[in-house]
Amino acid sequence: MERREFIAMLASTPAVTIPTAADDQAAAPAAALKPLSITLLGTGTPSPSLDRQSSGYLIEVGHDVIVWDHGPGAHHRLLQSGHRSVDVTHAFFTHLHYDHCMDYGRLVLQRWDQGADRVADLQVYGPPPIARMTEQLFGVDGIYGPDIRARIEHKSSQDQFEARGGKLQRRRPAPKVTEIRVGAVISGDGWEVTVGHAQHVEPYLECLAFRIDTSEGSICYTGDSGPTEAIVELAKGCDILIHMNHYFSGTEPSPAYRMACGNHRDNAVIAKRAGVKTLVLTHLLGQIDRPSVRELIVHEIQEVFKGKVIWGEDLMRLTPADARVSAIESRQG
């Protein structure tokens, strides 16, 4: 093929146009709703790890794709799971520790850039000061203000925007932010999220936990939390409880640390008292993420809690309807 023909072929290819979630919905039959599932994007901690990214979870339900927390590395896992930033419709944050929200910027900017004004604004929910954080990131005078201005005003960026299906004048990224507190209930198309209290690092950060209920089942996520009656009440009777499991019981640095983060024996009691069907352990430190230690923790939990216990892994997908677990991609090493 001559170089001129090759260039003409590249210029005419539609590959630069990114299908959006709205396109997918329009093309799909009305009954083609996604069954409720949750994918563990990041099951690690703030500590560096090549195996476990920081906190992030992806829920598929109906026509919506919801992320709960989006820490460093979570967005990479989202792409590995077969999803795109433009697929995400809602983002919820339990608290604003960096290991739970650092990829928020990547999600918003990549979704805005690839979506080319053809996707609805991202719905964002989180504790204060999520609104101020959003403005400081994406506002005119925000951290990414000069980047956003360049992508809106430079001719080359405008050309790329139009190639992706956009129509000038390009809008700024404008996440629709709602600050939430304990007791809030957010309703979607066939789902409802209830906001509960998490016991972690108050009063310096407001810390929340979430529960989603649908006709197919229920999932509760503690965020970061030590042992508290609030989690027992929020998780009552749910199909899946995803709980922080930071330490082996007795190895916490201090009593204060235990109250903020808990341990595996605390989690066993919470799961039992809440009457959940499945307990998923996450936010796992390297000191316990080892052969024999993992098995010992699961065994000791099962001495108290008689439901299913799952050692969470990045890219593990769970469906509460049948308690089925599948790995999207096996962890290396």
Where are the predicted features?
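Twin-arginine (Tat) signal peptide motif
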Residues: 1-7
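Intrinsically disordered, low-complexity regulatory regions of eukaryotic regulatory proteins
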Residues: 3, 21-22
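Binuclear metal-dependent hydrolase catalytic cores
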Residues: 7, 11-14, 23-219, 298-325
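N-terminal signal peptide c-region/cleavage motif recognized by signal peptidases
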Residues: 17-19
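Cap/insert and terminal regions of metallo-dependent hydrolase folds
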Residues: 207-209, 215-220, 225-316
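A polyampholytic, Gly/Pro-enriched intrinsically disordered region
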Residues: 327-333
